[in-house]
Amino acid sequence: MFTLADHTFSSRLLTGTGKFTNSHTMLASIVASESQIVTLAMKRIDLKLGQDDILTPLLAQGLTLLPNTSGARNAKEAIFAAELARDLLDTHWLKLEIHPDPKYLMPDPIETLLAAEKLCQMGFKVLPYVHADPVLCRRLEEVGCAAVMPLASPIGSNQGLATEAFLKIIIEQAKVPVIVDAGLGAPSQACRAMEMGADAVLVNTAIASSRSPIIMAKCFADAVKAGREAYLAGLGQVQPHASHTSPLTGFLQQMPAENTNTVEPL
């Protein structure tokens, strides 16, 4: 079981709602992923109606919505989006995203920390999307964030675990859940993140952009489960040298000396 912001979930795979070709494929993929938490960009909600037809099927599945502030360029804009999400969706949960660079979508660490501290004071359950920076993640934890979401590689890139060395440090030090976010492009990469000890992963593009999103969602679900079980089982230690699994040493030492001579060539 996975505990996040005082809620318990059976799935450790979070999914997104963007980039799918249609809403039917999106919903079927989410169901196949067994995910219980889905992210939702505020820009996808109709401000006049207060809702969008994307919400109805998601809520009907009993999913926990995690609105994000994607598109915010600074702390002020992110806080505005957070208040809007709280009013429209009646939730204090928030994925905090601040990326002023539209090309690479790198999160702004300074604005993110400023916004996170203020939002935590306002009662939000903040899950910040950040660089895989152990120092920043610790600071975010100190200001009250419910979890940290360090990136594996640039968002939407499918490049995989480019920040693995730093993710390991964050996982080792964190006292809040670590959700590896952004850039995971294959089920094997999600499995590896879980093997490292991540509490959960968030996947969107790798599922939505695949040839068969519904099947791919199921693959990610299975990979996350396998990775978590492998972590709990304890991976074998990597050795710098070879090691026999079934050495013959003891058996050969018991053989009579005359039987150990070199065989004569024919």
Swiss-Prot record:
EC identifiers of the protein: 2.8.1.10
Residues annotated as the enzyme's active site: K95 (schiff-base intermediate with dxp)
Positions with a binding annotation for 1-deoxy-D-xylulose 5-phosphate: G156, A182, G183, N204, T205
UniProt pathway: Cofactor biosynthesis; thiamine diphosphate biosynthesis
Pfam families xrefs: ThiG (PF05690)
Catalytically driven reaction(s): [ThiS sulfur-carrier protein]-C-terminal-Gly-aminoethanethioate + 2-iminoacetate + 1-deoxy-D-xylulose 5-phosphate = [ThiS sulfur-carrier protein]-C-terminal Gly-Gly + 2-[(2R,5Z)-2-carboxy-4-methylthiazol-5(2H)-ylidene]ethyl phosphate + 2 H2O + H(+)
Name of the coding gene: thiG
Listed GO CC annotations: cytoplasm
Stated name of the protein: Thiazole synthase
Source organism of this protein record: Shewanella denitrificans (strain OS217 / ATCC BAA-1090 / DSM 15013)
Keywords: Cytoplasm, Schiff base, Thiamine biosynthesis, Transferase
Top-level taxon of origin: Bacteria
InterPro entries reported in the protein's UniProt record: Aldolase_TIM, Thiazole_synthase_ThiG, ThiG
Keyword Transferase on entry: yes
Any single GO BP term: thiamine diphosphate biosynthetic process
Function, in words: Catalyzes the rearrangement of 1-deoxy-D-xylulose 5-phosphate (DXP) to produce the thiazole phosphate moiety of thiamine. Sulfur is provided by the thiocarboxylate moiety of the carrier protein ThiS. In vitro, sulfur can be provided by H(2)S.
GO-annotated molecular function: thiazole synthase activity
HAMAP family cross-referenced by the UniProt entry: ThiG
Keyword Transferase: yes
Cysteines engaged in disulfide bonds, as pairs: none
Subunit structure: Homotetramer. Forms heterodimers with either ThiH or ThiS.
Family: Belongs to the ThiG family.
UniProt main location, coarse: cytoplasm
Localization (cell): Cytoplasm
